[in-house]
């Protein structure tokens, strides 16, 4: 892959204006399209097949008024006055609401069939509205006529009266950004300028990240017309896209600047930077992408959609870094080259810097380091035992939001339970006295602990479904309300035995419990998926057993610490002022699984960027301790800069973030800080020091079955080092190439125009042909075939080298005639050529290739090749022999 990325980087550098124009055109096209055709966000939280959701769906069919989209107007009279004094104005407003086309029904506070719409003090009243927007979430423009009626009512009431709109229709808090989030980008710019040593260079990662986020957001806004997208999704994607977009560009750009400092040509440097660091970026992005798509394990639609769009944002960030960034490098050209160091500075002996000092401390005292870090992180994890989760509600919005104002007024004048009423539905089709039955159920429910009131208990018009509205004593995110839901569910068997009716409990809190239970159930399989993926990926990358185990344990410590810190601040209220939190509150239900997914990808990024350099030092002959220290000093500054940037981006989404995103941003900021600085840059060197040589041990059987990932562009580095090898004009040059158990070490050289025979047992002969054409993995030596280096560029060899085994074709003549030959052609089992047509087809093929390529004819023995004029015959060595040339 690194060779392909190298070519992509150079192409984008050369075609810079075209690439830049394409990306900016795509951004403009999607932006305009989104502005013209975007839909609205939907904050409906649903779980198909859950009992509460099925009850709600059934209610929509049998009692549509009870399940319709709702809104309410809260009217609060001035201190010392009663709303009854302004009944005429309120009733007129009810009529005005009723006249609006989207209002199915407007219920007056003095409706004789509904209780609880006037507060006990008489100072506040509620106007209930049932709305119909065709099943779609309403936009602010669609709600404007309703809001206008409320404003007119407030103007008609005595001075000091408050009229606020709230309820389900107004609970959608639209995503917004403020100047505070921009501070994170300013900090990122400062860090980039320090690391890269240039303000111009520092601006490139910001430009690419913002472009990528803009494209992803425009696409998301456009698709709101097709998909139900939660309002948390865009801010999550913006936050994540900016963080990874800047980091990915930093890794590539820092490599480019280092290479320019060493005197490399800018175009060549761009290609190498994309081929080497770009390989790590692809791996890093892929891990985050897979983890985000893994959120679908929970089988909760809104969470799956959130994961998909966040994953798309990360994918766009990766592609932008691999294409748009090298194009911008090409635009700046030599201006990206750092100023050369003075001769005096170059000769001055370097003093150990802070990174050398820090890794020295951790590796000199590994046991103390491990005990201290683990103890601190376990202690920080303990508050997670009290972690409270809930779905978003208006009470978690900013104080200036209309829905939040209405929420607070309802809590103050009617009690907190009015903001989260429960609905009990009853199947009363077999009842002969539906009104009496509903009255009995109402009396039973009013006697349950935690019930404040039952304002409504009525059958529908067909008398087959009953609806009971239950107002708890506590708010929707209070654990006591969840206890009440369970108490109502426990009474279902009693009501079936007593009244012969089946009942269900639904409403926001009931759905919340179902979602929380389903998310809790999904945590284990998702955790197994993440941990399993971590072990396999890192074992494949580092060819080690202990490195992935250590990395996974570190990831779990980071996740636990992030959970604990989030519970401490948001649930317990410790230092809540720091995050601009008014009061302790639950965090959004899907935060745990979301944090696990995102932090997994980010943790693997830092592990790969840091430990791969240590492994490189070890492979090149340094002792384990020297490799740890050298790798840390070399990669630590970039990893630290990347972590600081990511923390800054996340942290500045906290102060002004909407309720759900505030907790998510805080948890991610803490998680990244813990993982980067305590786990990867402190715990990892200490653990690797204790492991010593064992850190890089991998059983041979596991080494054979694991895939190989070239995350640091080692293949490209090898190809660059051997770009002139063998340098003799050959089209095929093999040096001790071998396949364990199949082909012994072989040496072979072909120049353009050569036609040779290769003989030997089927295994050795065919194995050699497959290995030389990139179709069989080699275990020793190397070769260059048609310009492709083996074993590194086996894919390129397969594209450039043709292989045909006549033992597997029905008509050799037709197969040979239809063949599109590559630079080198291997024809196996030529002894099967018997017809004149097949001989003619082979001669024609040889003539087509002979000009600038070579042909190898393979057979069991040399006698089968006598019909062809050959430049020589080569005996393919089997693995059991050392013979290399006939």
Listing of model-derived features with the role each one plays in the protein:
Residues 287, 833-867:
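Conserved catalytic loops of ABC-family nucleotide-binding domains
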Residues 742, 753-776:
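Glycine-rich P-loop/Walker A and Walker A-like loops and their local beta1-loop-alpha1 context
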Residues 867-884:
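A short helix-turn-beta junction within AAA+ P-loop NTPase domains corresponding to the substrate/partner-engaging
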């Amino acid at each position: 892959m690194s060779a392909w990325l190298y070519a992509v980087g150079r192409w984008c550098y050369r075609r810079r204006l075209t690439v830049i124009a394409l990306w900016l055109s795509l951004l403009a096209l999607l932006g305009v399209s989104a502005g013209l055709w975007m839909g609205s966000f939907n904050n409906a939280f649903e779980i198909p097949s859950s009992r509460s959701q099925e009850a709600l769906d059934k209610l929509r069919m049998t009692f549509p008024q009870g399940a319709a989209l709702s809104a309410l107007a809260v009217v609060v009279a001035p201190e010392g006055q009663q709303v009854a004094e302004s009944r005429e104005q309120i009733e007129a407003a009810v009529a005005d609401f009723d006249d609006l086309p989207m209002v199915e029904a407007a219920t007056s506070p003095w409706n004789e069939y509904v209780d609880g719409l006037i507060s006990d003090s008489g100072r506040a009243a509620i106007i209930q509205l049932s709305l119909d927007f065709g099943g779609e979430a309403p936009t602010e423009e669609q709600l404007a006529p309703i809001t206008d009626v409320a404003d007119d009512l407030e103007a008609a009431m005595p001075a000091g009266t408050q009229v606020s709109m709230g309820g389900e229709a107004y609970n959608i808090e639209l995503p917004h950004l403020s100047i505070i989030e921009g501070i994170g980008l300013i900090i990122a710019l400062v860090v980039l300028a320090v690391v890269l040593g240039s303000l111009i260079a520092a601006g490139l990662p910001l430009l690419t990240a913002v472009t990528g986020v803009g494209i992803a957001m425009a696409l998301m806004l456009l698709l709101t017309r097709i998909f139900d997208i939660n309002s948390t999704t865009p801010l999550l994607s913006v936050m994540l896209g900016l963080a990874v977009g800047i980091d990915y560009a930093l890794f590539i750009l820092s490599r480019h600047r280092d290479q320019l400092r060493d005197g490399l040509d800018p175009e060549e440097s761009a290609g190498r930077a994309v081929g080497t660091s770009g390989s790590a970026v692809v791996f890093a992005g892929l891990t985050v992408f897979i983890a985000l798509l893994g959120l679908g394990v929970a089988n909760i639609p809104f969470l799956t959609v959130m994961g998909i769009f966040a994953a798309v944002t990360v994918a766009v960030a990766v592609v932008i870094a691999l294409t748009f960034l090298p194009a911008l490098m090409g635009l700046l050209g030599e201006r990206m080259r750092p100023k050369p160091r003075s001769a005096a500075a170059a000769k001055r002996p370097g003093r150990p810097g802070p990174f050398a000092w820090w890794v020295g401390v951790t590796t000199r005292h590994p046991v103390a380091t491990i005990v201290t870090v683990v103890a601190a992180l376990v202690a920080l994890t303990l508050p997670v035992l009290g972690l409270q989760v809930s779905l978003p509600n208006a009470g978690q919005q900013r104080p200036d939001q209309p829905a939040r104002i209405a929420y607070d007024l309802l809590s103050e004048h009617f009690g907190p339970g009015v903001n989260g009423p429960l609905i009990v539905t009853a199947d009363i089709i077999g009842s002969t006295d539906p009104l009496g039955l509903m009255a009995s159920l109402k009396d039973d429910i009013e006697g349950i602990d935690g019930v404040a009131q039952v304002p409504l208990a009525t059958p529908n018009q067909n008398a087959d479904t009953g609806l009971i509205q239950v107002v708890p004593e506590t708010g929707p995110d209070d654990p006591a309300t969840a206890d009440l839901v369970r108490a109502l569910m426990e009474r279902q068997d009693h009501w079936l035995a007593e009244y012969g009716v089946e009942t269900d409990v639904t409403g926001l809190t009931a759905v919340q419990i179902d979602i929380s239970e389903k998310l809790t159930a999904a945590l284990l399989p998702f955790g197994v998926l993440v941990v399993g993926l971590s072990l396999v990926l890192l074992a494949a990358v580092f060819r080690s057993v202990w490195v992935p185990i250590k990395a996974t344990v570190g990831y779990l410590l980071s996740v636990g610490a992030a959970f604990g810190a989030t519970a401490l601040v948001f649930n317990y209220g410790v230092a809540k002022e720091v995050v601009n939190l008014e009061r302790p509150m639950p965090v959004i239900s899907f935060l745990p699984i979301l944090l696990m997914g995102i932090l997994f990808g980010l943790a693997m990024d830092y592990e790969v960027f840091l430990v791969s350099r240590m492994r490189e030092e070890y492979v090149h002959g340094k002792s384990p301790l020297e490799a740890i220290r050298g790798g840390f000093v070399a990669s630590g500054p970039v990893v630290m800069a990347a972590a600081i940037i990511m923390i800054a981006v996340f942290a500045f989404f906290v102060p002004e973030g909407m309720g759900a995103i505030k907790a998510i941003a805080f948890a991610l900021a803490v998680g990244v800080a813990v993982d980067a600085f305590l786990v990867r840059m402190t715990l990892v060197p200490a653990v690797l020091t204790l492991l010593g040589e064992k850190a890089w041990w991998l059983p041979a059987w596991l080494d054979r079955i694991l895939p190989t990932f070239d995350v640091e562009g080692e293949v490209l580095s090898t190809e660059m080092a051997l770009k002139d090898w063998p340098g003799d004009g050959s089209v095929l040059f093999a040096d001790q190439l071998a396949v364990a158990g199949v082909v012994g070490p072989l040496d072979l050289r072909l120049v353009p125009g050569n036609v040779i025979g290769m003989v030997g047992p089927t295994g050795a002969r065919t194995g050699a042909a497959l290995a030389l054409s990139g179709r069989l993995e080699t275990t020793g030596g190397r070769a260059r075939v048609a310009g492709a280096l083996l074993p590194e560029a086996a894919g390129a060899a397969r594209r450039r080298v043709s292989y045909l085994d006549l033992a597997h074709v029905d008509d050799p003549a037709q197969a040979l005639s239809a063949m599109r030959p590559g630079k080198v052609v291997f024809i196996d089992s030529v002894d099967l050529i018997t017809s004149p047509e097949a001989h003619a087809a082979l001669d024609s093929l040889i003539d087509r290739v002979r000009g600038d390529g070579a042909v190898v004819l393979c057979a069991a023995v040399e006698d089968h090749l006598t019909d062809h004029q050959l430049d020589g015959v080569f005996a393919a060595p089997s693995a059991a022999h050392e013979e290399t040339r006939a």
